[in-house]
């Protein structure tokens, strides 16, 4: 848990068939006086249980502040994933990590944070 930034992860499609593509949504809300850098790059990884793989590029909006390009936290980060074709019907959990760098506007410090996530998806026949 990061006391400076609140991250909520949801899945756009709660029910998917084996081999289907879904989308993870990352709501990133920095506290007052904190911003999220996009350099070094944001990173999303899935735990290695082979139930799903990331597909396509991460999609996010940015804003300019002076010479910096920052994450626009008013819009979610979107990352597509594809379920394995051999998935059996039932409930699964997509687990992984979201890595980002957050910084203090006033004090100038920055820190890396690895946010674990765990979202539920129902695999349908």
Question: For each predicted feature, which ranges?
Answer:
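Extracellular/lumen-exposed scaffold segments
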Residues: 1-125
């Amino acid at each position: 848990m990061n006391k400076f930034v609140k991250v909520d992860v949801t899945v756009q499609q709660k029910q998917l068939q084996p081999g289907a593509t879904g989308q993870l949504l990352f709501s990133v809300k920095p506290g007052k006086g904190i911003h999220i850098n996009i350099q070094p790059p944001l990173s999303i990884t899935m735990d290695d249980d082979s139930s799903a793989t990331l597909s396509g590029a991460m999609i996010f909006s940015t804003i300019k502040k002076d010479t910096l390009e920052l994450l626009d936290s008013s819009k979610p980060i979107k990352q597509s994933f594809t379920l394995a074709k051999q998935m059996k019907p039932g409930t699964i959990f997509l687990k992984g990590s979201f890595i980002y760098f957050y910084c203090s506007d006033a004090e100038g410090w920055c820190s890396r944070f690895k946010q674990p996530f765990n979202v539920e998806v129902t695999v349908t026949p």
